[in-house]
Design a protein with these regions (language model features):
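RNase H-like nuclease fold core
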Residues: 47, 113, 118-176
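C-terminal reverse transcriptase regions that engage the nucleic-acid substrate
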Residues: 1-99, 103, 255
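Active-site palm subdomain of RNA-directed nucleic acid polymerases
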Residues: 50-61, 149-158, 189-211
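RNase H-like nuclease module associated with reverse transcription
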Residues: 68, 118, 166-294
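Conserved pre-motif C helix in the palm subdomain of viral-like polymerases
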Residues: 32-60, 126-142, 171-195
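Structured nucleic-acid-interacting core domains from mobile-element enzymes and related host factors
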Residues: 85-125, 204
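Mobile genetic element proteins and their domesticated derivatives, centered on retroelements
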Residues: 18, 47, 55, 83, ...
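Short, conserved catalytic/metal-binding micro-motifs enriched in Asp/Glu and His
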Residues: 61, 138-141, 145, 261-266
Length: 294
């Protein structure tokens, strides 16, 4: 029963990195393991509905937890219930849009984003393991946990239109490479939204959509300023350059502290940083813009 649970400041349990939870299915009876998996799948399904619909701040935690839908352990179940504790303390947060750019919570927080009324995309990546740890002799390191998390969010009129978190299928050799892959994923979403805006005859599609990224090397690579260390990138990643060349997107650099896509790339241990980004994307009800809030 989680109706009267204690609230939590973030969806991430301190000291519990999902990728490092040791499976203990061998110590449970088949019936007990089945019961845990069934309860876990039901809970993750409900959380996933919220993460893809109205609560972008849940996306990373739900994405990581969903990897263990068929092999869940009691520790994974505790992690999922911790997300419920976070939700219990943030019920008044939600997505808000406004027709008046200057009154949006995005703009009033600080001078961000740069093109609030227009479609704007932010991308980021977290290179390597979630806890940024270096393996010790004898440690078992899986390929999965070494694959970076790629995140992006597309905003317009002060609120998020689309967001996603994916785990790259292959390990990146550098931070720059993982950021380029993130920009590629963000470009695909941006192009899709631009098609919808074209169907609605929105005038902004005559201009390139700004795509912000906090990695200078990735931005320079998009502008054809590459070096021999990046020659191994494949044709798939070249699609970012092609979209830039065709003026569909304009990739620009912004400081990492201002990149709201950072919310979608890691299990945050800095509560203050997480809450600042959370309040920008899904502001509390008292901060909803008026008129135009929803």
């Amino acid at each position: 029963d989680m109706l009267d649970c204690r609230t939590a400041p973030t969806p991430y349990r301190s000291g519990l990195v999902y990728d490092r939870i040791v499976p203990d299915g061998d110590t449970l009876s088949p019936a007990a393991q089945t019961a845990i998996v069934t309860q876990y799948q039901s809970l993750i399904g409900a959380l996933n509905w919220m993460a893809v619909s109205t609560r972008p701040d849940l996306t990373v935690s739900v994405t990581l937890l969903a990897q263990y839908n068929t092999t869940a352990t009691p520790a994974h179940l505790l992690g999922a219930k911790y997300v419920l504790r976070y939700l219990s303390g943030s019920l008044d947060h939600g997505i808000a849009f406004t027709s008046q750019s200057a009154s949006s919570y995005l703009s009033t927080t600080y001078s961000w984003p740069k093109d609030d009324p227009l479609l704007t995309t932010y991308t980021d990546a977290n290179w390597g393991p979630q806890d940024a740890s270096k393996p010790h002799p004898g440690d078992l390191i899986t390929l999965t946990e070494c694959c970076s998390l790629l995140g992006s969010i597309s905003t317009r009129t002060g609120g998020p239109l689309a967001w996603h978190v994916i785990r790259e299928p292959r390990v990146s050799r550098s931070t720059c490479e993982s950021e380029i892959k993130s920009a590629d994923e963000g470009t695909k979403v941006t192009q899709f939204i631009r098609h919808l805006l074209a169907d609605l005859h929105m005038p902004e599609i005559t201009l390139p959509t700004t795509l912000w990224n906090d990695n200078k090397g990735a931005v320079d690579w998009t502008h054809n300023c590459a070096n021999k260390k990046m020659r191994h990138l494949n044709i798939r990643n070249m699609a970012v350059r092609d979209a830039h060349r065709c003026s569909e997107i304009l990739i620009a650099h912004l400081p990492g502290a201002l990149n709201v896509a950072d919310l979608f790339t890691k299990e945050h241990k800095d509560d203050a940083h997480f809450l600042r980004l959370r309040n920008i994307i899904v502001p509390p009800r008292g901060k909803f813009p008026t008129p135009g809030g929803c």
